[in-house]
Regions:
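Short, low-complexity disordered leader/linker segments with a strong preference
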Residues: 1-34
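A residue-level marker of the well-folded mature domains of exported/periplasmic proteins
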Residues: 27-131
Length: 131
């Protein structure tokens, strides 16, 4: 588990180091302005896998940076239920939504179009999952 987290952190750092080379502009927001939501996949926040790790990381970061954080568990294991959880998070004021796992591929495509002002973070989702 620790190796997986370290790999994710390193991959993120590498991606950020390339941003200036490709003309990506930096956008800064005050952490206190962020209202972070996490939606679980078919598991819960005690699954000892992506949901739990993501929940713990989001909670710790939010506490350290003074951001509001909530998590949502879909009522069922379906794209519709995951979409409904994202809709609820946005209705509750979330402007950053974390969706851990490939099960969120369809949700990311649909919801990011519906909510262009919301930032979506999708650990363990690749372009191949979305296509």
């Amino acid at each position: 588990m620790k190796k997986r987290i370290a790999a994710m952190v390193l991959a993120g750092a590498m991606a950020l180091s390339l941003a200036p080379a490709y003309g990506v502009t930096e956008v800064k927001a005050e952490a206190g302005d962020m209202k972070i939501a996490m939606v679980t996949d078919s598991g819960d926040i005690t699954d000892q896998s992506f949901n739990q790790t993501t929940y713990e990381a989001c909670k710790a970061w939010s506490e350290e940076n003074g951001s509001e954080f909530n998590y949502y568990k879909p009522e069922s294991d379906s794209d519709e239920a995951r979409n409904a959880s994202v809709d609820q998070a946005v209705a509750d004021g979330a402007n950053v939504i974390v969706l851990p796992g490939y099960m969120f591929a369809a949700t990311i495509v649909e919801q990011s179009e519906m909510y262009p002002d919301v930032k979506f973070i999708a650990p363990d989702v690749s372009a191949g999952d979305i296509c």
